[in-house]
Amino acid sequence: GTVLPGIEVRIGDENEILVKAPTVMRGYHNKPEATAEAFTADGWFRTGDAGYITADGAIVLTDRIKDLFKTSNGKYIAPQAIESRLGEDKYIDQVAVIGDKRKYVTAIIIPAFEALKEYEKKKKIAYKSIEELVRNADIRHMIEERIEKLQKGFAGFEKIKKFTLLPNAFTMESGELTNTLKIRRSIINRRYSREIEAMYV
């Protein structure tokens, strides 16, 4: 969006949007620790949002800082931006991007099963179960090619290097989704640790 008159904006560490203005609070009453967390050392208010400023001065939000993670190479990744991009594909239903403190980015992907079954019919792929279908080499190759195209605008360190297809969707009932249908990253990391570790071998 456009910056309002009288408000200064700059981009800080981790691409955090920082603001300074007479209308911004000066701190929390009798809470010096909370105030120190909310402001930089030189008095800029931390919004908690990551983003950038365009050439014409507009602000673009990309993610919440708390949702960012850092690879072992020190690069910050905005997983939701990658998940949203991949989720645009008709063969991909859900995505959980992995990569916190790891060398590269991977993903657990839930295919859009109805679209996948149509593809399987067209290509005459024989399978006995959904588990078998997601392990099929032709299916994996097709998804891989589509991921490559979807990632074209990403920096090299943001690109998914490996992925795992799961035969079951993330659900609220299983605890893998919040009631607003956002993925619970910590639960997915724990529940699918074996599949995740296999992508880093």
Summary of predicted features, one role per range:
Residues 94-97, 144-201:
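Conserved C-terminal "lid"/linker of ANL adenylate-forming enzymes
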Residues 3-71, 88:
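Conserved ATP-binding/catalytic segment of the ANL
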